[in-house]
Amino acid sequence: MITAYIDFKSLDCFLALRPILKLAADCETLVSWQPYRSKQRALPTEVASESVTQTHHRVRAESERRLQQHYAELRELDIDPSRGQMDTSAALGWLAGLEGDTSSFVSRLFAAHWIEHTDINDPTFLEELTANCGLTRVHSTVNLDSIEREAEERGLFDAPTFLIEGQMFMGRAHIPLMRQLLTAGGDR
């Protein structure tokens, strides 16, 4: 099993979705989707007298955004970067309250947020999507702080993060290594 910690407002999570679903299908394993509110870093602005640390943070943030945009363009996705600034806590809490294979729900929710620009925190929308995916909501109240605290105790600090056989993989760059682990007789 792949445990995937995601945040719907994270473009990196959205870009990791299709490769993770393909990995799971190829390796005949399930994905357990778990909520984790990522900390969106604001793009620092250049100042006249910035320190080396400030320069590093600014250049790194700019590089991350260019790389995300590059991969979005390769998939012919027209991405509005402002979608990454929206709070998706209600949708994450809803996900945590569902029972069953939530992969279709997660896929549709990411598309609704990033492509269709839908308010994914809207309870009516979430109820309809849950029904359309054949899922059941078993918990109407979820403590995201508690879920995140437990994840952080395991070493998690951002999304997307994936757990396979107790090993943690931060970011989508590790998907080839995850494939190697799963195909070498690992967890199925």
Regions found by a protein language model. Name each.
Residues 3, 7-34, 100, 104, ...:
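C-terminal cap of thioredoxin/glutaredoxin-like
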Residues 12-112:
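Structural alpha/beta surface segment adjacent to cysteine/selenocysteine redox centers
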